[in-house]
Amino acid sequence: MKLRHFGRTGWKVSEIGYGMWGMGGWSGSDDAESSGSLECAVEMGCDFFDTAWAYGEGHSERLLGELVRAHPEKRLYVATKIPPKNGKWPARSEYRLDETFPPDHIRRYAESSLKNLGLERIDLLQFHVWDDSWAEDERWQRAVDDLKREGLVLAFGLSLNRWEPENGMRALHTGLIDAIQVIYNIFDQAPEDELFPLCRQLEVAVIARVPFDEGSLTGKLRLDSRWPEGDWRNHYFGPENLKASVARAEALHPLIPQGMTMAEMALRFILSNPDASTIIPGMRKLRHVETNLGASDHGPLDAELLERLRAHRWDREPAPWSD
């Protein structure tokens, strides 16, 4: 597993991390299976784990805390997120800071996450949603600065709305944001336009999330794909999105090199960009951990393939089905 610099923090983290959304105790998740997959990831050199209070109201955080405490000999980086007070995703400009991240709410959830994790500090605490209309509000800035000065949180970050990579750039200029989490993949290349250059300039780490576009870039999405009742993908891949996603993914099949899967190609597309500090594919099953983390061994894609993949950029606007 190769390591990358994580912005200005001084950390060097695994270039493929672990997204723990699927370990929130949802339907289909199994704690024993999840713990086994996490252990495998550590053995393979993964040291960056991204969770959130909202993933099962602390359930995923507790699993991560158990993992970290079981490996005192290793430096495992813990990233978690504060939910918005109003419980609404995504953030919208009409929501005031008092409705989303007032100072007392920031501290309360920082302390709640510390309790769930069973740790003395959080490496990276992130706002789970963000709108840049709040960027200049000094109240969240003071709350973040206080948590850092007290040593409860080492670094702070933002998780950006889907398909709004510029909606966070004003906050970066405060100097308080150390990392940005953004959707970036073969289809979603827009962060390269303005966000990534600013992150380079300010030495802000980039966490690339949704590397498989919720599943279309695994190569397994079909027009008749269905998921268990309650699975969010039934909403995301509804009539407005499924047909287009399948067509876009099928257009990539001729580009997949022999001996490579579409999922590996998707991960290595991101690895080919040095602006990405780490990628956090969601993983629950052992076989996915092994194949996804193994992509680090193969390195970037060749320049010709990268150029051809760039033609598959797909700029989209947020919609009710994408929330």
PLM region descriptions:
Residues 1-76:
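N-terminal binding-site loop/beta-alpha segment at the start of enzyme catalytic domains
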Residues 12, 42-45, 72, 118-121, ...:
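Short loop/turn motifs at secondary-structure junctions
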Residues 15, 48, 121-124, 154-155, ...:
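Residues at the N-termini of beta-strands
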Residues 29-41, 100-117, 162-171:
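Short, acidic/polar
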Residues 33, 129-323:
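Beta/alpha (TIM)-barrel catalytic core signal, keyed to glycine-rich beta->alpha loops juxtaposed to Asp/Glu
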Residues 74-87:
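A short, structured active-site edge motif that brings together acidic residues
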Residues 86-100:
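Surface-exposed, active-site-proximal loop segments in enzymatic domains
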Residues 114-133:
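Active-site groove signature of glycoside hydrolases
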